[in-house]
Regions:
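Short amphipathic, positively biased membrane-proximal segments
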Residues: 1-168
Length: 168
């Protein structure tokens, strides 16, 4: 993700972003325990919703991407003396990860379909902002992060459609 072939991201920064993303994944997964998945199976869903097995693969890939690209962006910003931008990136990442885990709680745990559709839209906007910030630090990191907001837009469409199909 850099112009030089020998670039290695700062291991401490990578460890911090990996732990943060891992915590997000864990907190989000608590909300979707087996009892909740039975509820999800009973929901009316549009035909384009992927099979359940796609979601853990997609999210594991996206979480790894978020950790690596965010570490790269933060490291690049700090190395360039752009400390304020690095701090702002960390704040934006933290907010994004809170929104990310929060969606699972809104949708699965609290079964608030309308609120989760709105939450997904806010997460998509936050994810696009994160990709923009990453691109400002390192264009390749920004490009590598683009699948995240795209998936979040897809999740927004799915969430909204599920909400519409299941309104009472």
């Amino acid at each position: 993700m850099s112009e030089s072939k020998g670039y290695q991201v700062n291991k401490q920064i990578l460890a911090a972003t990996t732990l943060s993303v891992g915590a997000t994944s864990g907190i989000g997964s608590i909300a979707s325990q087996p009892r909740i998945t039975r509820w999800y199976a009973r929901l009316r869903k549009p035909s384009y919703v992927p099979p359940n097995g796609v979601f853990p693969v997609a999210w594991t890939t996206l979480y790894a991407d978020i950790a690596v690209t965010s570490a790269t962006a933060i490291d690049r910003l700090r190395a360039a003396g752009r400390d304020k931008e690095a701090r702002n990136y960390v704040v934006a990442l933290a907010a994004n990860l809170i929104l990310n885990a929060g969606w699972s709680w809104l949708f699965f745990k609290y079964q608030k379909l309308g609120a989760s559709a709105i939450g997904a839209a806010v997460l998509a906007a936050s994810s696009a902002d994160l990709a923009r910030r990453a691109a400002a630090a390192d264009p390749r990191a920004g490009a590598a992060l683009v699948p995240y907001p795209l998936w979040c837009v897809f999740a927004t469409v799915m969430s909204a459609h599920i909400w519409l199909l299941n309104r009472r």
